[in-house]
Amino acid sequence: MNEAAKTLDGWYCLHDFRTINWAELKTLSTEERQQIINEFLDLMEKWNDTEAQGEGSHAVYTIVGQKADVMLMILRPSMEELNEIETAFNKSRFAEFTVPAYSYVSVVELSNYMAGDSDDDPYQNPHVRARLYPQLPKAKHVCFYPMDKRRQGDDNWYMLPMDQRRELMKSHGMIGRSYAGKVKQIITGSVGFDDWEWGVTLFADDVLQFKKLVYEMRFDEVSARYGEFGSFFVGNLLTAEGIPSYFYV
């Protein structure tokens, strides 16, 4: 059997995409609508407290286009906690005016393709811990997409020897590193958790950097020959201060 890549796993992750029922929202009185907004802000305040304690992170973005209106990205130490947050949101009055559009369940992941030789416990390495248990940046823009490694004929990633996969991922990773300071990337593994194998979440203050990064990577063999990609979701940061105006109708 071919050698499988080993992974380091961090916080569990939920991407929850919702479409807003604007027609129903318009039927509410100003007072009712404000109560719903306040309830959602209370939920966000609880998430802020959790983030301040270093026990998780979150980000809220509006989505451009017809695939969804809002994306909630939640990181927590356990799958149970993700379920609790999802359930609490679904029980809120605000959720009555949303329709689930898409979701993605995964876990923050680092592979051993780029790892050096060391007997030290990687989970005690501050640099590794910062990547496995990240505080999500509140960048102006987000881009999310799921992906697989191709398994077709001669283009079967999983039949390549470990050394060849490691070398390919090294050159692939160098492209991503060249965007350091421009794009923050969170890779989450989802084999056995969702329909795709990985989720990729990109954060940037300049939305054009998403296009530049993804386009450049398409010419790298890892993407050009072995990459399969799902739908792309692009959006803009929604802060607590911006929520009242966003939901004003």
From Swiss-Prot:
Cofactors named for this entry: Fe-coproporphyrin III
Reaction(s) catalysed (UniProt annotation): Fe-coproporphyrin III + 2 H2O2 + 2 H(+) = heme b + 2 CO2 + 4 H2O; Fe-coproporphyrin III + H2O2 + H(+) = harderoheme III + CO2 + 2 H2O; harderoheme III + H2O2 + H(+) = heme b + CO2 + 2 H2O
InterPro entries reported for this sequence: CHDC, ChdC/CLD, Dimeric_a/b-barrel
Domain of life: Bacteria
E.C. numbers: 1.3.98.5
Catalytic site positions: 145
Record: residues binding Fe-coproporphyrin III: 131, 145-149, 172, 185, 223
Cofactor descriptive note: Fe-coproporphyrin III acts both as a substrate and a redox cofactor.
Pathway involvement of the protein, from the record: Porphyrin-containing compound metabolism; protoheme biosynthesis
Keyword terms: Heme, Heme biosynthesis, Iron, Metal-binding, Oxidoreductase
Family matches, as Pfam families: Chlor_dismutase
A Gene Ontology biological process term: heme B biosynthetic process
Gene Ontology MF, one: oxidoreductase activity, acting on the CH-CH group of donors, oxygen as acceptor
Enzyme class, UniProt record, top EC level: oxidoreductase
Function field: Involved in coproporphyrin-dependent heme b biosynthesis. Catalyzes the decarboxylation of Fe-coproporphyrin III (coproheme) to heme b (protoheme IX), the last step of the pathway. The reaction occurs in a stepwise manner with a three-propionate intermediate.
Family under the similarity heading: Belongs to the ChdC family. Type 1 subfamily.
Name assigned to this protein: Coproheme decarboxylase
Organism this protein belongs to: Halalkalibacterium halodurans (strain ATCC BAA-125 / DSM 18197 / FERM 7344 / JCM 9153 / C-125)
Taxonomic lineage of the native organism: Bacteria, Bacillati, Bacillota, Bacilli, Bacillales
